[in-house]
């Protein structure tokens, strides 16, 4: 709808409104009608003017929109044209590249085709050669089969053996060889397992020992009693020696009175009787009344006092290792071990040490620690009575454990710790190991210097008795022997055999505690001088 139509429509509406108004108010005066008509005409003119202005504005906007639309369409057209041209150029470039790749591939295929053609020719040539060689091999196989048959017949004739007999001999030799190989493999596996077991055992033992700290004082077979003056020696001897005879008869201990100033020596191998004698003599010296009746009185008194002291020693040791609910009599018997020695080592201290080591070993092995300590504590209880009751200390200790209803594992441990019976539990084995460790610890026990020196000399003598040995040195208190050999006489393989021969001689000819390490050293030196 254009502007003119709108204007005409507005005029028509105004005329209709005026006519209606005029018709309704026809009776009004003409002046009012004219006024209204003029007013309507003015409004119509105003509307017409506004309509014209709006029409002009719309026309201008339409023209501007038209121009803008044309410009936009032109730009869009140019943009699309450029995009189409770019796409066309890109496609043309891709086509060129594709054409180039196809050309290159075609060249490669041509080269491969030439190569395949050459290979086919080579294969054909090789196939012909193979056919010729196959024919030749077939002929040679026939010849070899004929020759083998002749050789087989000739061998059967010479050896008087059939093919089956020869096969059986070969199989037998093969079986023997395989058996040797299997034995070697088994031996190597056993050696490897032994090395691993030794390594693990050393680790466990080192862990167990490093957690045990105990004092060890070498026990003596004599006791020394100090005197206030040398005049006391005559009073101890008494008139015609009656005091000293009574003293020695009641205590069983030798009283040695010599030129040592202000001292008397009590000598005896029973530590209990020696302790009673020491206590009695000290009290006699302190009291000053020395006569047979007084000696007898004090000996009996000190014997009872020592019984009480031994029970205290046993209770203290049992408490230290955690051996609870131990029978009172067993505690007293264990206390007697405080006055017993084995190779100079206090047996009660040794029992406590064995209990601690066995407990540590049991802890590392996952065994019952308390039971291991109890078994280790009681393992040498028989030594408290072995000089009073017939039988070995193992037998006496086993009977005591049975009498006081100890655990069967403890009984078996006591019975087997020296190998007299078979150990029936891991704890028995651990206690035996702990016993050996405590006894073999450097400084724990002593032996005579003569035996020690003799053992070292015997070790060196056995080692140097073999041909090719230059010298030998016994080290670590006889626990290791190092053998130096002459390199021009023995090879590296021969020194392995020498080490084994030395080991066998030592095992056959010597008695020794623990193990002895044999190290054979072969040293070759090449010396020259730069001038």
Curated annotation (Swiss-Prot):
User: What task does this protein carry out?
Assistant: Endoribonuclease that initiates mRNA decay.
Which PANTHER family does the UniProt entry name for this protein?
RIBONUCLEASE Y
According to its UniProt record, where is this protein located? Cell membrane
Organism taxonomic ancestry: Bacteria, Bacillati, Bacillota, Bacilli, Lactobacillales
Q: Which Gene Ontology cellular-component terms appear in the entry? A: plasma membrane
Q: What is this protein called?
A: Ribonuclease Y
* Statement: the UniProt record of this protein carries the keyword GTP-binding: no
Main location, first listed in the record: membrane
Similarity section? Belongs to the RNase Y family.
Alphabetized GO MF terms = RNA binding; RNA endonuclease activity
């Amino acid at each position: 709808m254009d502007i003119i139509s709108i204007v005409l429509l507005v005029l028509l509406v105004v005329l209709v409104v005026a006519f209606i108004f005029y018709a309704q108010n026809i009776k009004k005066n003409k002046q009012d009608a004219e006024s209204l008509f003029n007013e309507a005409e003015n409004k119509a003119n105003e509307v017409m003017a506004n309509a014209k202005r709006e029409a002009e504005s719309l026309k201008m906007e339409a023209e501007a929109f038209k121009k803008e639309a044309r410009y936009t369409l032109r730009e869009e057209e140019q943009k699309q044209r450029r995009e189409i041209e770019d796409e066309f150029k890109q496609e043309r470039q891709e086509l060129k590249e594709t054409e180039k790749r196809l050309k290159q591939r075609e060249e490669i295929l041509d080269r491969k085709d030439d190569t395949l053609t050459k290979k086919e020719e080579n294969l054909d040539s090789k196939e012909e050669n193979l056919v010729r060689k196959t024919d030749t091999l077939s002929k040679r196989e026939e010849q070899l089969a004929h020759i083998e048959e002749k050789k087989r017949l000739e061998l059967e004739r010479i050896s008087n053996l059939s093919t089956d007999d020869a096969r059986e001999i070969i199989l037998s030799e093969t079986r023997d060889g395989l058996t040797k190989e299997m034995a070697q493999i088994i031996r190597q596996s056993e050696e490897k397992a032994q090395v691993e077991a030794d390594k693990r055992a050393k680790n466990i033992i080192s862990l167990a020992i490093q957690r045990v700290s105990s004092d060890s004082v070498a026990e003596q077979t004599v006791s020394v009693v100090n005197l206030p003056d040398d005049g006391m020696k005559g009073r101890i001897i008494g008139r015609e020696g009656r005091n000293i005879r009574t003293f020695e008869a009641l205590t069983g201990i030798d009283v040695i009175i010599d030129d040592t100033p202000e001292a008397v020596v009590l000598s005896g191998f029973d530590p209990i009787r020696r302790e009673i004698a020491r206590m009695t003599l000290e009290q006699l010296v302190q009291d000053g009344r020395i006569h047979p009746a007084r000696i007898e009185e004090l000996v009996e008194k000190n014997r009872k006092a020592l019984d009480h002291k031994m029970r205290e020693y046993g209770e203290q040791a049992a408490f230290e290792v955690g051996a609870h609910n131990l029978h009172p009599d067993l505690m007293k018997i264990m206390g007697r071990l405080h006055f017993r020695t084995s190779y100079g080592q206090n047996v009660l201290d040794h029992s406590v040490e064995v209990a601690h080591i066995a407990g540590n070993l049991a802890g590392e092995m996952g065994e019952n620690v308390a039971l291991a300590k109890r078994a280790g504590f009681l393992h040498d209880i028989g030594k408290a009575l072995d000089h009073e009751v017939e039988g070995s200390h193992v037998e006496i200790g086993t009977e005591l454990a049975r009498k006081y209803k100890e655990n069967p594992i403890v009984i078996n441990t006591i019975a087997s710790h020296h190998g007299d019976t078979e150990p029936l539990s891991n704890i028995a084995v651990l206690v035996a190991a702990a016993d050996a460790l405590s006894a073999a610890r450097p400084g724990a026990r002593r032996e005579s210097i003569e035996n020690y020196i003799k053992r070292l000399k015997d070790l060196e003598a056995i080692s140097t008795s073999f041909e090719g040995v230059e010298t030998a040195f016994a080290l670590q208190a006889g626990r290791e022997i190092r053998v130096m050999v002459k390199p021009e006489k023995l090879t590296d393989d021969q020194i392995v055999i020498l080490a084994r021969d030395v080991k066998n001689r030592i095992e056959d000819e010597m008695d020794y505690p623990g193990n002895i390490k044999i190290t054979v050293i072969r040293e070759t030196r090449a010396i020259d001088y730069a001038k």
